């Protein structure tokens, strides 16, 4: 019996849903002080860098038919894989809570029924998506994405309707910091993408489509957020929707975009949990993560996510850099045979520290790219030195 696989189109839909996100729109509002021209340039450069890494990460999982965190074991060993799986579950629980919080806050700003009510509604819809399952979402996802696409076109028409764009509004953010904030969003998906590309009929093509679709749509959301902040003078999503006169249409954008994006976070948290605890059922774990996210969203305020994004970058940028070096350049999978690959662990620590140090330096292309390049070079040189000694 043939195992059910996802098509290129289905993978594109999944990542369209990931890109249409309140988190992207909200992050885009931070770019307003740069002005439209510089802001768009920073968004595009950052997404090109981030989505190239996203593609390479997805190819590794697609070719090996392994989940994202299982592929990590090829470079870091069994215990190393468990370590990153644990960190990934933590960041995904965080993302789930943040997304539900943002969605509920924005929905409540449009239709005042209580934030906690919207937390429950959005959480219940995410659980429904999980129960249906990634390989059975085809028609439902097509309808949801079509509706979402139309609604975001309406939002774009309202935001850009007069054809005018604004100039710089201040110097609150450097260009390099803006690029890094643009890289950070696709980078946050690095530990997830293989969970979906491993299910694809044509993994490399599906990964390419996933990265391109996500990159284009995410850029679109960033630009909407940036120009909405300029257009309305607001950085609050609900106020932007209300001032734009979107009403119920805005509410639907908020709810559906939150569900389709957060589903990916919760689902991948479940898959990663299987790497930490082998007896856990991924689907049930994903439901538990959603419930925890709902509770967190109800109890805790989560208004600024920039530090959270940078923390994700500092953890996962050097991790994927080592994986890229091992899989594509060194062609090695030796770490599967060991409990912990100490050398790659040390190189990751160096990459992590380097990322945090580079955050204090204003680099036009952001700090992710130089951090990853240096980490890859260190990884290659270290392996070459070992071979020479042998």
Question: What are the residue ranges of the model-derived segments?
Answer:
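Transmembrane alpha-helical segments of multi-pass small-molecule transport proteins
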Residues: 14-18, 84-89, 110-132, 145-156, ...
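Membrane-water interface regions at transmembrane-helix termini and the short interhelical loops
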Residues: 29-33, 59, 102-110, 123-144, ...
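Juxtamembrane transmembrane-helix boundary signature
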Residues: 44-76, 83-89, 383-388
């Amino acid at each position: 019996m043939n195992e059910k696989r996802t098509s290129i189109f289905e993978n594109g839909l999944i990542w369209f849903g990931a890109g249409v996100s309140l988190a992207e729109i909200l992050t885009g509002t931070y770019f307003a002080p740069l002005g439209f021209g510089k802001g768009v340039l920073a968004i595009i450069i950052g997404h090109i860098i981030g989505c190239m890494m996203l593609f390479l990460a997805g190819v590794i999982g697609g070719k090996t038919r392994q989940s994202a965190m299982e592929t990590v074991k090829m470079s870091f060993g069994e215990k190393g894989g468990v370590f990153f799986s644990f960190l990934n579950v933590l960041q995904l629980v965080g993302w789930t809570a943040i997304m539900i919080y943002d969605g509920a806050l924005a929905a409540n700003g449009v239709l005042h029924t209580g934030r906690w009510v919207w937390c429950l509604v959005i959480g219940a819809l995410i659980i429904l998506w999980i129960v249906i399952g990634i390989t059975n979402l085809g028609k439902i996802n097509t309808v949801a994405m079509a509706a979402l696409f139309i609604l975001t076109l309406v939002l774009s028409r309202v935001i850009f309707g007069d054809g005018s764009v604004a100039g710089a509004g201040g110097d609150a953010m450097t260009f390099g910091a803006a690029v890094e904030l643009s890289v950070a969003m696709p980078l946050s998906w690095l530990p997830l993408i293989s969970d979906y590309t491993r299910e694809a009929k044509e993994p490399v093509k599906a990964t390419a489509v996933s990265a391109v679709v996500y990159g284009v749509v995410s850029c679109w959301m960033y630009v909407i957020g940036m120009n909405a902040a300029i257009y309305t003078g607001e950085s609050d999503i609900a106020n932007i929707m209300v001032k734009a006169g979107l009403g119920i249409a805005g509410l639907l954008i908020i709810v559906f975009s939150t569900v389709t994006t957060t589903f990916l976070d919760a689902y991948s948290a479940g898959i990663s949990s299987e790497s930490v605890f082998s007896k856990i059922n991924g689907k049930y774990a994903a439901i538990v993560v959603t419930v925890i996210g709902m509770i967190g969203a109800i109890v805790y305020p989560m208004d600024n996510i920039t530090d959270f994004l940078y923390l994700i970058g500092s953890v996962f940028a050097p991790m994927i850099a080592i994986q890229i070096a091992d899989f594509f350049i060194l062609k090695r999978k030796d770490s599967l045979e060991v409990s912990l690959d100490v050398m790659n662990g040390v190189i990751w620590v160096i990459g992590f520290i380097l990322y945090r140090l580079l955050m204090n330096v204003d680099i036009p292309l952001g700090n992710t790219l130089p951090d990853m390049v240096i980490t890859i070079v260190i990884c290659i040189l270290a392996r070459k030195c070992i071979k020479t000694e042998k």
